[in-house]
Amino acid sequence: TCGETLDLVREARKKGIDVTCDVDLYHLLFDDSVLLELNSAYHLLPPLRAKADKETLWAGIQDGTVDAISVNHVPVLRQDAEVNFEDSIPGAISLEVALPAIWKELTSRVSDARAIELLSYAPARLSLALPAYEIGSTLPAHLVLLRPDTPCVVSANDFAGQVCNSPLLGKTLPSSLLGSYINGAWRTLANA
């Protein structure tokens, strides 16, 4: 989440060390200036960094140092999140809002194909827990349908679970989700 880390990744790769690098969504969207609000929704681990670090992370995405964008989905119970900043448990949920939150900014900096790679194929391929998904006529569909030019306001109803600790709550996102296909079945947040 800080610029110096990308320098370490680049140096390791120059030495032939097989290292991967991901950056989470919220460190690309926010910098530490929002911490002045003392809003516990911004209490994240690792913590939000300076604007210069955020821009360095974006540069790392553009030059290929960053291999994937992660969601860093960390649910926190309401009673642990809706307290004073210093008493709150760090974390934020993001699965339901990651794509519409980041798509416009990401595709203004990289191609659509690179954005899809960073948000889907690369995280699946790099994760030890997930297979790298393929698309084919005989395979079950795992797709997310995005309306890239249709804004939406994030509300607690957008989250599938009972937890809605997100710095995006109440914010207008530049894109919105239509729904998804999971194992070939159509899903919306209402029936996920």
Which residues does each PLM region occupy?
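Residue-level signal for pocket-adjacent positions within structured domains
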Residues: 23, 39, 43, 80, ...
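His/Asp/Glu-enriched, well-ordered alpha-helical/loop segment
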Residues: 41, 68-69, 74-148
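A short acidic, glycine-rich active-site loop
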Residues: 42-53, 89-93, 166-173
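Histidine/acidic residue-rich metal-binding segments in metalloenzymes
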Residues: 1-69
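Glycine/Thr-rich phosphate-binding loops of Rossmann-like dinucleotide-binding domains
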Residues: 6, 29, 77-79, 153-154, ...
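Short amphipathic alpha-helical segments
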Residues: 10, 81-82, 157-158
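C-terminal cap of metal-dependent C-N hydrolases
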Residues: 140-191
